[in-house]
């Protein structure tokens, strides 16, 4: 009824994990998990940077297109 908040439940789970993987393998698994999480976070941050750079490029293209359109209007008025 208390769910998984009871310390005895966590102790049983820890015992099962130790029996399945062995005491030597657990630190290696934790290290691998930590590296995986770090890599995931780094890639998420990298995706944010790529999105920002893409947005800047699109804004620059729009500004360049508007400038070119203004220049051709000026040339048309001169002719």
UniProtKB/Swiss-Prot annotation:
Biological process, per Gene Ontology: protein transport by the Tat complex
Bilayer-spanning residue ranges: 1-21
Compartment(s) of residence: Cell inner membrane
Alphabetically ordered keywords of this record: Cell inner membrane, Cell membrane, Membrane, Protein transport, Translocation, Transmembrane, Transmembrane helix, Transport
Entry-linked InterPro entries: TatA/B/E, TatA/E
Major subcellular location class: membrane
Basic and acidic residues bias (residue ranges): 49-61
Segments for region (Disordered): 49-79
Topology term for the membrane: Single-pass membrane protein
Domain of life: Bacteria
Pfam families: TatA_B_E
MF term (GO), any: protein transmembrane transporter activity
Leader peptide range in chain numbering: none
Cellular component, GO annotation: TAT protein transport complex
Protein family membership: Belongs to the TatA/E family.
Function: Part of the twin-arginine translocation (Tat) system that transports large folded proteins containing a characteristic twin-arginine motif in their signal peptide across membranes. TatA could form the protein-conducting channel of the Tat system.
Record text on subunit structure and interactions: The Tat system comprises two distinct complexes: a TatABC complex, containing multiple copies of TatA, TatB and TatC subunits, and a separate TatA complex, containing only TatA subunits. Substrates initially bind to the TatABC complex, which probably triggers association of the separate TatA complex to form the active translocon.
Stored HAMAP family: TatA_E
Protein name: Sec-independent protein translocase protein TatA
Organism per entry: Campylobacter jejuni subsp. jejuni serotype O:2 (strain ATCC 700819 / NCTC 11168)
Gene: tatA
């Amino acid at each position: 009824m208390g769910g998984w908040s009871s310390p005895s439940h966590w102790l049983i789970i820890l015992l099962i994990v130790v029996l399945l993987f062995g005491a030597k393998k657990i630190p290696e698994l934790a290290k691998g998990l930590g590296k995986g999480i770090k890599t995931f976070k780094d890639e998420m941050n990298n995706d944010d940077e790529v999105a920002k750079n893409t947005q800047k490029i699109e804004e620059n293209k729009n500004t360049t297109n508007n400038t070119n359109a203004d220049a051709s209007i000026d040339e048309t008025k001169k002719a």
